[in-house]
């Protein structure tokens, strides 16, 4: 239930209260939510919720119901309840409530079987979000650090695709083990187009999670390869922290968050190779026939892409301007109208659930203008809209009719260290003004992408455009 509806309920209660006792036998009994609702196994008035965490709830009594605001998500049987309302149809509902890291108050509207309502306010304090910037930074530091102690430094650098590269193979095995350890059916997909098995055209890590509906498929991914030595525009990199170790680690954290959830469609979480060589990794997955490739007999509904993460709002540049934040849905066939339903999810997540500043601008112009709406938002911090912008693996799936979201941090003139030896974790920290600032920036974009996926999964209007 949104805040306006909650306020309406409260207003009604205040208006009715002075009339109590005036109607004799018609007087209704008082509502006691604690008789039917528990949060974390205690009465609501004794509960304390934490930001960014799941909390168990129990709702008893046929016909009783609860509803929540947009930034308090309801899950039943591991599945998101999109209308934010659940009613007891039998005896008891067991579920979970998920706050965001930015939830400042928890208001639950309780309604009994007779239609009487009561507003329940639950205190909230700082928590450890299920996906968080600190975990992201720790894993980034482990992957990109090189030392003699393998418990402290993974040393998964030099992940160049193309010629035989033991460093890339070693990193792929590490990533595969992460997904397998979380219970995903995980495969390494090698595709060889030129006859030399020692030089695969692509080598992807594909993790599968079965959905309830066997007729559809959806996915999320980011590329794990980095720009090779001599690559344009900056001469290549050995660490590739921004492009795209950052997106790779976000996928590892999403896998952990999704492990106990139930999705409608079969779901793939992927780490692509050969993105820097022309999207060859995602194309190999989408266009080849194998047991763990993209199924050709199922409807591909949507795909979300993570590429170059962290250098974005709420982080600030050294000149005092916020870094631009880019998130584009697509395809955008007609710039004058909304073309795809996933755009509504994109907008709702950023501005209704996560409460990002829609109209924040800078004096002047940002330095990158590659999308078809650039003239409309050259100075807008939250560049969140429908667009055809490409340059990454979402294009592979958009070309197959899927609705897509592409998350991308600052690029070109706004942050030009990618594809260069300067693309390091230390440089990212320095550019945003500190580790905490980088963690906060990553936490926001990871929550945006995670919620987009969860909500899109339960949005039937999101269909393949060729269906």
Regions found by a protein language model. Give the residues of each.
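Surface-exposed, short loops/turns at beta-strand junctions within beta-sandwich domains
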Residues: 95-104
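N-terminal capping segment at the start of a domain
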Residues: 122-169, 414-426
